[in-house]
């Protein structure tokens, strides 16, 4: 039996389906959120809440344990289990690596202009200081857990996450790396987008209201260019704090005027897809691995994608031959000139070869071989 510790996230239903397709009847998924009710994960016979699992765990024998995003709750569960002859896999999601482990060691995820963290960075802010001390202690505990309990480090899409982990924590160099991804390209795109290409000249900033999008940083860069009457679409309807969203909207209106178009409410998928197809320039201010699905969609559709070179995704994309551009060096010509057709085709071909269902199944099988 293969035990999967997961969060209550949309992606997990697809994860259940694909692991069951590869290993039918061999998987048990435990949703580790605090409550027993699930918002996104569909209840099935092989899906348990945390409390249900705690009551029945003695009924199961496991050969593998998969941690889909490492956090304290999952570590607590694992610490109650016997791991004799159990192979333990940590599948990195991004937050668990960059925010929780690399930031306490000095990795920067926020641009200096990011309003969400200006206050706590002030030297006299005791709360900010205490938070940083706590983060360091939590990181030390997590690394100790990984050293003692984890056998394999698994990266989702961006394989250089593993090298970043070892750069900051060389004591984990004996942990074996495995490759993996959650979604094949046809699922990422959906039936509408897989047949589409860019047909507009709009711009898009980021993928959510998460402060790690560094929206204000991107808006400031973009404000120095002449964007004419093009729309600057900024998705802000989920995954962010109210004060941060308000700050982004305020600055966007101030610097970009009527061109600035924040998406503050849920947009139906068909309408959002039309927006994505209208975007010829996609700007991502993230300094950590994030928004990879949105980046893949933009590249597939034929948009020019701009990333900060401090973002590990920039390095990853270029290592696979994908054409991406440096955000900090964006020019007027860059936004006025569409991506060449030969480059659009090449990006699409690379993504189509990387993210096939067949390759995903092979990687899942390779996890245990």
Go through the PLM ranges and name each one.
Residues 246-266:
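Nucleotide-activated donor-binding/catalytic signature segment of Leloir-type glycosyltransferases, i.e.
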Residues 274-287:
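Acidic donor-binding loop of glycosyltransferase active sites
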Residues 10-14, 210-224:
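A conserved mid-protein helix/loop that constitutes part of the nucleotide-sugar donor-binding site
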Residues 334-369:
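A charged, aromatic-enriched C-terminal amphipathic alpha-helix characteristic of glycosyltransferases
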Residues 130-176:
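A short, active-site helix/loop in glycosyltransferases that binds the activated sugar's phosphate group
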Residues 193-213, 222, 232-234, 352-353:
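Conserved donor-binding/catalytic core segment of Leloir-type glycosyltransferases
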Residues 94-135:
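Acceptor-binding helix/loop patch of EC 2.4 sugar-transfer enzymes
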Residues 56-74, 87-93:
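Short N-terminal targeting/anchoring amphipathic segment
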């Amino acid at each position: 039996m293969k035990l999967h510790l997961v969060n209550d996230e949309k992606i997990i239903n697809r994860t259940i389906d694909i692991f069951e397709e590869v290993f039918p009847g061999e998987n048990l998924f435990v949703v580790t959120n605090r409550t027993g009710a699930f918002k996104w994960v569909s209840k099935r016979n092989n899906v348990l809440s945390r409390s249900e699992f705690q009551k029945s765990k003695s009924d199961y024998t496991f050969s593998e344990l998969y941690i889909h995003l490492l956090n304290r709750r999952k570590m607590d569960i694992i610490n109650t289990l016997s791991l004799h002859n159990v192979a333990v896999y940590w599948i990195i999601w991004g937050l668990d690596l960059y925010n929780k482990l690399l930031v306490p060691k000095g990795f920067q995820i926020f641009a200096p202009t990011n309003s969400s963290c200006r206050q706590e960075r002030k030297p006299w802010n005791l709360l900010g200081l205490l938070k940083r001390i706590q983060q360091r202690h939590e990181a030390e505990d997590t690394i100790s857990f990984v050293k003692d309990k984890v056998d394999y480090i698994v990266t989702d899409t961006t394989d250089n996450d593993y090298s970043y982990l070892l750069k900051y924590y060389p004591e984990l160099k004996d942990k074996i790396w495995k490759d993996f991804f959650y979604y094949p390209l046809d699922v990422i795109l959906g039936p509408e987008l897989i047949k589409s290409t860019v047909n507009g000249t709009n711009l898009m900033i980021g993928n959510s209201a998460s402060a790690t999008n560094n929206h204000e940083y991107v808006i400031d860069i973009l404000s120095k260019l002449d964007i004419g009457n093009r729309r600057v679409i900024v998705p802000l309807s989920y995954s962010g704090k109210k004060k941060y969203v308000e700050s982004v909207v305020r600055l966007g209106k101030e610097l970009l005027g009527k061109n600035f178009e924040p998406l503050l409410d849920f947009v139906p998928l068909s309408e959002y897809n039309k927006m994505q197809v209208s975007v010829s320039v996609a700007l991502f201010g993230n300094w950590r691995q994030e928004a990879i699905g949105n980046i893949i969609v933009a590249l597939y559709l034929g948009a020019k994608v701009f990333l900060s070179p401090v973002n590990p995704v920039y390095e990853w994309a270029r290592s696979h031959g994908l054409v991406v551009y440096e955000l900090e060096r964006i020019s007027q010509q860059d936004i006025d000139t569409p991506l060449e057709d030969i480059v659009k085709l090449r990006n699409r071909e690379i993504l189509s070869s990387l993210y096939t269902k067949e390759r995903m199944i092979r990687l899942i099988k390779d996890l245990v071989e």
